[in-house]
């Protein structure tokens, strides 16, 4: 059983566990976007990273866990929108890849 644990923040990470052992940890793939070059989750790179690491597994033997997070005091509306967008990209990629 492969467990993929995801910390969805821009400074987050993706961890791959198998049989109680950490197999790999990668930083959240990001890219600069917009006039201000704000960092966002790079969905294309995340798809590639996940695809590469799960290719030898049967989809039924994979579970994905995404950290459930909420707003923190003092965070502005824009920050929360950006975070929600990153969260949505991650969930969308997992859904498109049919990862449970």
Outline where the language-model segments fall.
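Phosphate- and other anionic-substrate recognition elements at nucleic-acid/protein interfaces
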Residues: 1-100
């Amino acid at each position: 059983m492969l467990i993929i644990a995801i910390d969805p923040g821009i400074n987050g990470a993706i961890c791959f566990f198998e049989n109680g052992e950490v197999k790999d940890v990668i930083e959240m793939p990001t890219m600069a976007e917009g006039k201000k070059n704000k960092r966002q989750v790079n969905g294309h790179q995340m798809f590639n990273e996940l695809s590469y690491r799960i290719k030898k597994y049967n989809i039924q033997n994979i579970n994905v866990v995404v950290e459930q997070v909420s707003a923190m005091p003092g965070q502005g509306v824009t920050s929360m929108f950006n975070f929600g967008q990153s969260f949505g990209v991650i969930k969308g990629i997992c859904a498109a890849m049919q990862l449970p």
